């Protein structure tokens, strides 16, 4: 390492962030970058630690510790420190095809496993990664070049989310001819319509897609495979098909009044907002969806937080966010040691904005809804909430959250956004290809591989593993591409 004592000499410094009262005025990204020289010093903070857990991607207690892509984090950080941005990009590209996405939306599993984070703040690897890829784009290093030799093999990728794009990029590099099918009007899947623009500017996706097109990858939009096009057709036309349709089936809540008007699945709400912004070049903001309304967000995860931030930008009168689980501790518990993922309280951008705008945290912990009430016209007007407590099942030993009698309360509600996670993939896609779904409604695979029961059909991403992170989807797309390559050519490059 070029600066073994860098972690002692330099404090962590993050890029500038626009204050909540300013950033809620628009849907623009609000995380800036440090000047180049200051970013270099952040690379210098990477220690010469004996075991770099940051790049391990090891599963501990059911959660990933370190990067699932196995990015060579210490090497990239060292090259950043030396100001060798071109080689930093080359090194990062060996494992990662889309750093511009993860450097914006990843929870930074690498930083959670950083050795420096044991006694100080971890190395800002996520921001270093963003600096590297933005330098690469600005200096013409990211090129869409067609492979010199084509194999003559054709592969269809169903879905253009992070897993599908990753699979397509890696297969194309090996010389296979790749066509990506997307059911929506624009490429990007979850990246396009599941993540708000202020978190991932859609021009970032467009920039990458242009590179992929220049490299010879074809994209067909408004093509809902399983409905518009049959799986059998594609099986005949292509040598291999990879199903990367995501876990797009949202989990519902079944309570009285669920049929009231004004109750949305979060993914539909976020997608509607983004589509209208894109269709009008950000000139028309769909304020009518939430302006002046009391918004109830059900779910305390990332999507729920995105709903909070989006509702505030649309002029909501109030926002309440329900979280079934107890409030996480401020610091790690003894039962959650490093390098496990830290189960600690996180206040994300949406909650920060709610605190700034409304003067309080929008989250109600250990709370769920038991009923929605309607006006005469069928529109939702209130929600009945109840407090929960953990209770252990004596037979199984499992803890579950159960209602506490006498804790019901009613709050006014005009808009409900259900962000309770996803159950799995849409069944009609798998059915069209004649492949099975498992008990979790993910596509069933052979011996934990990416292969289904049919030789030509593989799967990757959330459609394979269930709802997960963008970084996992990219990793799965890459590994599934290797499996396809090996099945077609008899070998692949590791």
Predicted feature residues:
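Feature captures the FAD/FMN-dependent oxidoreductase FAD-binding
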Residues: 87, 149, 154-158, 206-255, ...
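C-terminal catalytic lobe of FAD-dependent flavoproteins
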Residues: 12-13, 18-37, 42-45, 365, ...
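Glycine-rich Rossmann-fold phosphate-binding loop(s) that bind the pyrophosphate
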Residues: 158-162, 299-301, 462
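A conserved FAD-binding loop/helix module that cradles the flavin
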Residues: 304-307, 314, 460-491
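FAD-site-proximal beta/loop scaffold in flavoenzymes
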Residues: 259-292, 391-467
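Glycine-rich dinucleotide-binding loop and its adjacent helix/turn
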Residues: 131-149, 207-227, 250-314, 437-453
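Beta1-alpha1 glycine-rich phosphate/pyrophosphate-binding loop at the start
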Residues: 5-32, 41-44, 57, 68-82, ...
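Immediate flanking context of iron-sulfur cluster ligation sites
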Residues: 4, 31-61, 85-109
């Amino acid at each position: 390492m070029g600066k073994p004592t860098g972690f002692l000499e330099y404090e962590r410094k993050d890029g500038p962030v626009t204050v909540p009262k300013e950033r809620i005025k628009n849907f623009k990204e609000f995380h800036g970058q440090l000047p180049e020289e200051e970013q270099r010093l952040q690379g210098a903070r990477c220690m010469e630690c004996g075991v770099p857990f940051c790049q391990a991607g090891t599963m501990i207690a059911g959660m990933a510790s370190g990067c699932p892509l196995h990015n060579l984090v210490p090497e990239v950080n060292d090259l950043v420190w030396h100001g060798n941005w071109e080689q930093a990009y080359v090194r990062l590209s060996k494992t990662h095809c889309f750093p511009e996405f993860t450097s914006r939306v990843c929870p930074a599993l690498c930083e959670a496993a950083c050795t420096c984070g044991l006694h100080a703040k971890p190395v800002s690897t996520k921001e270093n990664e963003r600096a590297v890829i933005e330098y690469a784009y600005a200096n013409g290093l990211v090129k869409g070049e067609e492979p010199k030799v084509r194999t003559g093999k054709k592969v269809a990728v169903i879905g253009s989310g992070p897993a599908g794009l990753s699979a397509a990029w890696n297969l194309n590099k090996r010389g296979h001819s790749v066509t990506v099918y997307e059911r929506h009007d624009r490429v990007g899947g979850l990246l396009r319509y599941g993540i708000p623009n202020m978190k991932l500017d859609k021009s970032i996706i467009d920039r990458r897609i242009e590179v992929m097109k220049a490299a010879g990858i074809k994209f067909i939009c408004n093509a809902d495979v399983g409905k518009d096009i049959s799986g059998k057709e594609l099986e005949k036309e292509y040598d291999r098909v990879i199903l990367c349709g995501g876990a797009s089936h949202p989990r519902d809540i079944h309570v009285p009044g669920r049929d009231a008007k004004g109750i949305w699945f979060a993914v539909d709400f976020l997608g509607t907002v983004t589509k209208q912004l894109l269709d009008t070049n950000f000139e028309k903001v769909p304020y009518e969806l939430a302006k002046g309304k009391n918004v109830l967000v059900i779910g305390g995860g990332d999507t729920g937080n995105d709903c909070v931030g989006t509702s505030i930008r649309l002029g909501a009168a109030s926002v309440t966010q329900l979280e079934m689980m107890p409030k996480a501790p401020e610091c790690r518990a003894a039962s959650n040691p490093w390098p496990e993922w830290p189960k600690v309280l996180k206040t994300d951008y949406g909650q920060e904005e709610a605190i700034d705008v409304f003067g309080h945290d929008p989250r109600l912990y250990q709370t769920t809804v038991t009923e929605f009430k309607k006006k005469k016209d069928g529109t939702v007007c209130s929600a009945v909430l109840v407090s929960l407590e953990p209770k252990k099942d004596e037979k199984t030993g499992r803890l579950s959250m159960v209602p506490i009698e006498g804790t019901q309360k009613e709050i006014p509600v005009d808009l409900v956004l259900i962000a309770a996670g996803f159950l799995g993939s849409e069944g009609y896609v798998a059915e069209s290809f004649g492949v099975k779904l498992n008990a979790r409604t993910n596509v069933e695979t052979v011996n934990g591989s990416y292969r289904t029961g049919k030789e030509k059909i593989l799967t990757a991403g959330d459609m394979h593993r269930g709802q997960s992170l963008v970084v996992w989807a990219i990793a799965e797309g890459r590994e599934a591409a290797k499996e396809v390559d090996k099945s077609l050519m008899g070998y692949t490059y590791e």
